[in-house]
Swiss-Prot record:
SUPFAM superfamilies: P-loop containing nucleoside triphosphate hydrolases (SSF52540)
Keyword Cytoplasm: no
Ranges of Polar residues composition bias in the record: 110-122
Annotated compartments: Nucleus, Nucleolus; Nucleus, Nucleoplasm
Gene source species: Dictyostelium discoideum
Single GO molecular function: preribosome binding
PANTHER family in the cross-refs: AAA-FAMILY ATPASE, NUCLEAR VALOSIN-CONTAINING PROTEIN-LIKE
Function per UniProt: Involved in ribosome biogenesis.
Family the UniProt entry places it in: Belongs to the AAA ATPase family.
Biased composition (Basic and acidic residues): 834-843
Compositionally biased region (Low complexity): 123-132, 141-172, 180-203, 844-855
Gene Ontology BP annotations: positive regulation of protein binding; regulation of protein localization to nucleolus; ribosomal large subunit biogenesis; ribosomal large subunit export from nucleus; ribosome biogenesis; rRNA processing
Signal peptide residue numbers: none
Protein name listed in UniProt: Putative ribosome biogenesis ATPase nvl
Length: 867
């Protein structure tokens, strides 16, 4: 093709057409505007500076012009050929065929020409017929695509002997736009199979599939099955009951919970259990860059679902397309929300029409069919069969139009409020973080087809996995299986290498690597006897626990399975108080409910720094095997208005979704100082946070099975409303340890350290230099003694294992000083006495309490007067 030089005044469209013809499209199977646009932007960088939408329109215009030019050229060539044949000699001796056209130098021209012929051939005639044609159910399939092509043969190929006379007919004019309903662009498709590449969105919108899983593939969802049965199973299986009672059946269910808790799996299991089609799409499959197409996809989804009713529509991550309209950043988001609301409301309207109008029309048709059956066969059995079929048809027609919509999100607070009212998403089901019993059931379901050892303990694994959701447990099982395979190969390597005993350790390692390659590549399959002896053992799961980090831990949950009461020395009084307030209500909830105690307790621990307040909170959460959320006071504060309050709400919502749960607020004085500019120096931002905390702790909504532990070393600046009953009921003072308690703490800290026999921990704990030592100071003392023992070993060039001697402790005592001064210690003791006096304060003379009348006396201004 001759290269053209364009001047500044030449038509831009011709330049673009010339560049399209120069493109190398030999390796492409599908040509459309998007593909050609991307190729042009790759080859010619100046097109990247143009707006994408406007440039696509230019490409579309150029493609249409190319098709028009090709068709006109082909028509003129055919006319010239016919004229030459007529003017040729009438000699019958030899028939000379017209010369074949030279092969085209551009593949695009050939493909566009063949596609143009195919479209003209398949164009329906303009003459109308009296018999109405049955409308194709799937209008999205182009006319030139064979929808029944199930093999790899090209059934859509064009016959090379087809004449071009149809090109010149008036009814065969090329169309301006060859639209495909998937994206609204010109599509030129040349493929050898029926794979509709790029149209997976439309397939999900138009095809409902019945899943193969059911409730037997789930575990730990027994608490949700009752709501599912009431709001999904009953309306789909027996809608006639609701119509007979004159009530509208439920239409929508909103599943919310943390990521990986099983929302999508539950929706598929519901459809599989009921044997109804499921339209499962992601919210991003609905969105489109073309204005109005996103709303059209929502309408298409609901219309196709109504055509296949009864069925279920499942929209995953619905918060992506239905955010709050007042805070939406784009008009498209508002339009999608409005369209979704309209479609959900139309389900009730269609249901009422189907229950009144459609059965009557169907009844007339069924009566006519019944008469035809009686005319053909007058036997009574045929009449009875026809009437039974009519009753079944009426029942099926009655079910027509009932569609359940299930939405899934992990951010329900971001949904538009109009979606969460009656008639739309009637019921909200929370799938929180499973407890120990639910984790055990999930583990049994996931490992049902795995070969586990005979004495496998499900309860122990469930105990060691607090905060794990279904996806985390599934990942844990896969990691355990990987560890099992590695253990099997390692045992084979050790068995094989033990036979060869004439090599050094380094040589043995090299041989093991070579043997591993031999086992993986050239080794024959293991015998059935050996395979039967292979199992996944408990040790494989315990190794996997060290590698798998639950997703909830990244969202603020903290799983502390390693801290127990054994790691906490002394503090027996504080431990007893925490056991009565938190541990027992979590372990034995029924006993407390039978006594009428349903509100969980809150505990405020205060005292000097380093006395073990945070360690106690971790230990109590680990002992009761509850979910644990650790919140540092300042991390919830945000400079933007409303963000701090939202963070507080999110913490309590997350805890309620994963109950029983313990929320631990460290440095609580930074989060809840006194309001009104008191000693804490509160301001408007912190006052709003305090108000939000007060509401969440003891507001209109009960915090069921959500326990609160707060720790601070400045209880005097905390807002007084926080410490009233119903919020932080108990105030526990954690003092500096006594000499006896210091000895117990030292024993706890040194149980993993090699200590010489001459070390007397009681003497160290009662030493006067340890006076006013906190737990953190004692931990630093032990660490300093161990470091001195290591340094002494290096100085003496000793090869024996180092042990901590009494000299090391004496050296550490000479260097470590108490972190809490004597003045601070007295201040904390005085503060504790003041708090106890304020709570134990009673009237001096209880017998002289003035008694007032039952009816209050008011003055003329309606002010109460107390005598």
């Amino acid at each position: 093709m001759v290269n053209k030089k364009y001047t500044s005044g030449q038509n831009e469209n011709e330049k673009l057409m010339d560049r399209i013809e120069k493109l190398d499209l030999s390796e492409s199977n599908i040509l459309n505007n998007d593909f050609i646009t991307n190729e042009l932007r790759k080859v010619y960088p100046e097109y990247n500076r143009k707006p994408l939408k406007g440039f696509k329109q230019l490409v579309e215009k150029a493609m249409n012009q190319i098709i028009k030019n090709l068709s006109s050229c082909e028509s003129s060539e055919n006319e010239d050929g016919d004229n030459k044949m007529e003017e040729s000699d009438g000699d019958d001796v030899e028939i000379i065929s017209p010369p074949l056209p030279p092969p085209s130098s551009n593949i695009l021209n050939e493909q566009l020409t063949s596609q143009y012929k195919q479209n003209i051939k398949n164009t329906p005639p303009t003459t109308t017929t009296t018999t109405p044609a049955k409308r194709n159910r799937d209008e999205n399939i182009p006319s030139n695509v064979n929808s029944n092509n199930n093999n790899n043969n090209n059934n859509n190929a064009i016959n090379s002997n087809t004449t071009t006379n149809n090109v010149n007919t008036p009814n065969s004019k090329p169309k301006k736009k060859l639209k495909n309903s998937s994206n609204g662009n010109n599509v030129f498709q040349f493929s050898n199979n029926n794979n509709n590449n790029g149209n997976n969105k439309d397939n999900n919108l138009s095809n409902g599939l019945i899943p193969t899983i059911n409730f037997s593939n789930l575990g730990g969802v027994e608490s949700c099955l009752r709501d599912i049965r009431e709001h999904i199973e009953y309306p789909i299986c027996h809608p006639e009951i609701y119509s007979h009672l004159g009530v509208e059946p439920p239409r929508g269910i909103l599943l919310h919970g943390p990521s990986g808790c099983g929302k999508t799996l539950l929706a598929k299991a519901i459809a599989g259990e009921l044997k109804v089609p499921l339209f499962a799409i992601s919210a991003t499959e609905i969105t489109s860059g073309v204005s109005g197409e996103s709303e059209a996809r929502v309408r298409t989804l609901f219309s196709n679902a109504i055509a296949q009713a009864p069925c279920i529509i499942f929209i995953d991550e619905i918060d992506a397309i239905a955010p709050k309209r007042e805070s939406a950043s784009k008009d498209m988001e508002r339009r999608i929300v409005s369209q979704l609301l309209t479609c959900m409301d139309s389900l009730n309207y269609l249901s009422s029409n189907n229950s009144t109008n459609e059965p009557n029309e169907q009844t007339e048709q069924q009566q006519q069919q019944q008469q035809d059956i009686i005319e053909v066969d007058s036997q009574a059995t045929t009449t009875t069969t026809a009437s039974n079929n009519n009753n079944k048809q009426q029942k099926n027609d009655f079910k027509k139009g009932h569609v359940i919509v299930i939405g899934a999100t992990n951010r329900p607070e971001s949904l538009d409020t109009a979606l969460r009212i009656g008639g739309r998403f009637d019921k909200e089901i929370c799938l929180g973080i499973p407890d120990q019993t639910a984790r055990c059931k999930i583990l049994k379901v996931i490992t049902s087809k795995m070969r586990l050892e005979n004495n496998f303990d499900y309860e122990e694994i469930a105990t060691l996995t607090p905060g794990y959701v279904g996806a985390d447990i599934n990942l844990l099982v896969k990691e355990a299986a990987t560890n099992s395979v590695n253990r099997i190969f390692t045992s084979n390597l050790n068995g094989a290498s033990s036979s060869s005993s004439s090599s050094s350790s380094s040589t043995t390692n090299i041989n093991n690597i070579g043997l591993s390659t031999e086992l993986l590549i050239s080794k024959e399959p293991l015998e059935p006897e050996k395979l039967n002896s292979l199992y996944i053992e408990m040790i494989d799961f315990k190794k996997a626990l060290k590698k798998v980090v639950p997703a909830a831990k990244r969202e603020g949950f903290a799983t502390i399975p390693n801290v127990t009461w054994d790691d906490v020395g002394a503090l027996s009084g504080v431990r007893e108080e925490l056991t009565n307030s938190i541990l027992r209500p979590i372990r034995y909830p029924k006993k407390y409910k039978n006594m009428g105690i349903d509100s969980p307790a809150g505990v405020l621990m205060y005292g000097p720094p380093g006395c073990g307040k945070t360690l106690l909170a971790k230990a109590i959460a680990s002992e009761c095997q509850a979910n644990f959320i650790s919140v540092k006071g300042p991390e919830l504060l945000n400079k933007y208005v409303g963000e701090s309050e939202r963070a507080v709400r999110q913490v309590f919502q997350r805890a309620a979704a994963s109950s029983p749960c313990v929320i631990f607020f460290d440095e609580f004085d930074a989060l809840a100082p006194k309001r009104g500019g008191g000693d804490g120096g509160g301001n408007q931002a912190t006052e709003r946070v305090v108000n939000q905390l007060l509401t969440e702790m003891d507001g209109l909504e009960k915090r069921s099975e959500v326990f609160i532990i707060a720790a601070t070393n400045r209880p005097d600046i905390i807002d007084a409303a926080m410490c009233r009953p119903g919020r932080l009921d108990k105030m526990v003072y954690v003092p500096l340890p006594s000499p006896e308690e210091r000895c117990e703490i030292l024993k706890t800290l040194t149980h993993k350290i090699p200590i010489h026999q001459d070390v007397d921990l009681i003497k160290v704990g009662t030493d006067l230099r340890c006076h006013s030592f906190s737990g953190a100071d004692l931990s630093l003392l032990v660490k300093e003694a161990a470091n001195h023992a290591i340094s002494r070993g290096f100085d003496n060039n000793s090869t024996e294992p180092d042990t901590v001697t009494m000299e090391d402790f004496i050296f550490a005592l000479s260097k470590i000083k108490p972190s809490v001064s004597r003045k601070d210690e007295l201040m904390y003791d005085k503060l504790n006495n003041d708090i106890n006096k304020s709570r134990d304060k009673k009237p001096n003379n209880s017998n002289n309490i003035p008694i007032t009348n039952n009816i209050p006396i008011t003055n003329n201004n309606n002010n109460m007067i107390i005598n």
